[in-house]
Amino acid sequence: MHTTQKDTTYTKIFVGGLPYHTTDASLRKYFEVFGDIEEAVVITDRQTGKSRGYGFVTMADRAAAERACKDPNPIIDGRKANVNLAYLGAKPRIMQPGFAFGVQQLHPALIQRPFGIPAHYVYPQAFVQPGVVIPHVQPTAAAASTTPYIDYTGAAYAQYSAAAAAAAAAAAYDQYPYAASPAATGYVTTGGYSYAVQQPITAAAPGTAAAAAAAAAAAAAFGQYQPQQLQTDRMQ
């Protein structure tokens, strides 16, 4: 002979979010106002005997269970509980109006440029998508920031007389052992060539004996420069 078990699909209620001090008696007392109760139990830990924070209440009929689940914010023993039919599980938590999601705001400068590329950096074309505007860097500014030598151009040679400069250039040209060719012209520069000067030359007023002596010393120092050694190394 088999005993018939009552169907509790629509009468058994899951109660979650209970305080640890809630007992079977206090749980039953809360649900008595909705109708007759067949069972009210708080689930406890077997080893410690403390409440696990949830329980089950079985109402006598389906109508009483529906009334017990209507309240969206039930308060049991001073704490908001989660009440729903057991076969449905716990109710999803309802977000309060005005709940703000933690979305990080982006700076306008990062939105305007893909991947937040700053404007004062120069990136290779292979790493930049088409459409990214990269500021143009003047060649003179780039050369001034990268060259380790002192560029002795116009202003630096102003202290020498035109005659001394012409004589020095002629002396340097006479010492070059190779004939001029189109291939060799790429190695010869006449203006803006960088030299490492060890001792500064004292400027003197033009038309004086000191100016003539300074010009002669500059011509002699310039004439001792032998560019053929540098050219030989490059052509080997």
Curated annotation (Swiss-Prot):
CDD domains found in the cross-reference section:
RRM_RBM24_RBM38_like
Q: What segment(s) does the record annotate as region Necessary for interaction with EIF4E?
A: 175-199
State whether keyword DNA-binding applies. no
Q: Which UniProt keywords apply?
A: Cytoplasm, Differentiation, mRNA processing, mRNA splicing, Nucleus, RNA-binding, Translation regulation
Its GO biological process annotations read: 3'-UTR-mediated mRNA destabilization; cell differentiation; DNA damage response; endocardial cushion development; mRNA destabilization; mRNA processing; mRNA stabilization; negative regulation of cytoplasmic translation
- Domain of life (superkingdom): Eukaryota
User: SMART domains attached here?
Assistant: RRM (SM00360)
This protein's GO CC annotations? cytoplasm; cytosol; nucleus
Domain RRM residues, every copy: 11-88
Subcellular location(s) of the protein: Nucleus; Cytoplasm
User: Molecular function terms in GO for this entry?
Assistant: mRNA 3'-UTR AU-rich region binding; mRNA 3'-UTR binding; mRNA CDS binding; pre-mRNA intronic binding; sequence-specific mRNA binding
- Main localization of the protein? nucleus
Biological role stated in the UniProt entry: Multifunctional RNA-binding protein involved in the regulation of pre-mRNA splicing, mRNA stability and mRNA translation important for cell fate decision and differentiation. Plays a major role in pre-mRNA alternative splicing regulation. Mediates preferentially muscle-specific exon inclusion in numerous mRNAs important for striated cardiac and skeletal muscle cell differentiation. Binds to intronic splicing enhancer (ISE) composed of stretches of GU-rich motifs localized in flanking intron of exon that will be included by alternative splicing.
Q: How does it assemble?
A: Interacts with EIF4E; this interaction prevents EIF4E from binding to p53/TP53 mRNA and inhibits the assembly of translation initiation complex.
Domain comment as written in the entry: The RRM domain is necessary for mRNA stability and mRNA translation regulation.
What's the name of the protein? RNA-binding protein 24
Source organism: Rattus norvegicus (Rat)
